[in-house]
A protein has these predicted regions:
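Non-catalytic C-terminal interaction segments of nucleic acid-processing enzymes
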Residues: 3, 98-185
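Short, well-structured alpha-helical interface segments that form or flank functional binding sites
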Residues: 16, 39, 63-67, 137
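Catalytic cores of nucleic-acid endonucleases
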Residues: 59-111
Length: 185
């Protein structure tokens, strides 16, 4: 007689993916914040010196996580996505190779550890012109305030980007603005 079928390993939750990515980045020497804006706009923000990386996590819906990483590129020097399995990660790489999403790092979680299928690459090559330089500088100031305690961890701040056309002169592409955190008197 055979016993019950072996249980299939359960798929990790998004919280598990974020935790694994946070631990992975901390081991690499980054200071890491999970949901630093209190609005769940940024899943993870990692900083080492002046370098800022952003990580978006999704258990399913790979297209959405890639779109999120592309939208958030204005604030980080690099972005990565972390998904629940190697097959999903491989699908993301196959769909994004040769596209503007190719610099996005693609990671998956295996038994609680992050595996990198494609490492994250900088959005702007060394010496290249950075169309988001001002936004990245402002975002670093927000991270400085978080690191120093001037902006308490877990405090809600308006870091969610808004599509505006001011700098583009209305030429049809959206640019992003980072709202400064506000202090209560």
């Amino acid at each position: 007689m055979s016993g019950p079928a072996p249980r299939r390993a359960s798929r990790p939750s998004e919280r598990d993916l974020v935790r694994a990515a946070r631990d992975h980045l901390a081991r690499l020497g980054y200071t890491v914040w999970a949901d630093p804006d209190g609005h769940d706009y940024f899943d993870l923000v990692a900083r080492k010196g002046e370098e800022v990386g952003l990580v978006e996590a999704k258990v399913a819906d790979a297209r959405t996580v890639v779109a999120q990483a592309l939208r958030r590129r204005a604030w980080g020097d690099w972005t990565a996505v972390v998904v629940a399995g190697r097959r999903g990660a491989a699908g993301i790489v196959a769909r994004t190779d040769g596209t503007r999403a190719a610099p996005i790092g693609v990671w998956w979680v295996d038994a609680g550890s992050v595996r990198e299928l494609r490492p994250a690459r900088p959005w702007v090559p060394p010496g290249g012109e950075d169309p988001f330089a001002e936004l990245r500088t402002r975002f670093r100031r927000v991270l400085d305030a978080l690191a120093s305690g001037d902006l308490p961890g877990g405090a809600s701040w308006d870091g969610v980007g808004r599509a505006i056309r001011a700098a583009s002169g209305g030429r049809g592409f959206a640019e992003w603005r980072l709202d400064e955190p506000t202090r209560e008197p």
